[in-house]
Structures are given as structure tokens and as C-alpha cells.
């Protein structure tokens, strides 16, 4: 990161959520599916979660990428006040939520459409959507 942008590095050891609180982060030791949503594995660690709205970040954001293993709605709800300053949002909302492995397509799509984003591109291969803000404030 310092090579690409040496004067503007801010790292936060926090998970994004819709609440500022400690939460269980369930660990998947056999793959990359660790999540804040219980998916049948009892091994977890306690982590600090924060709303993106509470973090001092640059005024304008070109791309906000959300890949939260089924926790995408909560991440976006916690970013609601920042949405007016984000041009693009990429969301991986595949079948990863909880023990039933539900997708979050309908909930995420409804939320983003109601916040003046339009679905720009969609990939069935990985269930990823790219949304573009109608107009930035």
C-alpha cells in the first residue's frame, strides 16, 4: 500500500457492521468462508465491529467492495451515511449466509436501489453485482 499511496494509508483492525459492538467471527479453518454469520462451525474469535459511518475516511470513494461471506446487508446498512459519496459498489452476494447458505441478492439489491444506485453489471458466475450511483453529492 505504501508503494501506491504513501501519504494516505489508514488501516483499521475492525470488521464492518451495522452496529458498533464486539461480535463473534466464526472461523472456517478449511476454506475462506469465515463469517460474522454462524454457519455451523463453533470455532470463533471476538472482534470489534464498527459502522463505516463512524470512520473518518476520504470524502469521495470511487469503489467500495463488499465481500463479507453473507454479512453484506449489515455492512451496507452501517455505511448508509457514506453512500452519497460512493460512486461504485461491488457486492459478492452469493450463497454464503448462515447454515442454509442463502444469498443476499434481494436484500442488498433492494437496499442499494432505494439509495439511488443502479445495477450496472451482474455476474452469475460468482453472483457479483456492480452498482453505480445515479449522481454523487
Regions found by a protein language model. Give the residues of each.
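Phosphate/nucleotide-binding beta-alpha loop and adjacent structural elements of enzyme active sites
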Residues: 1-137
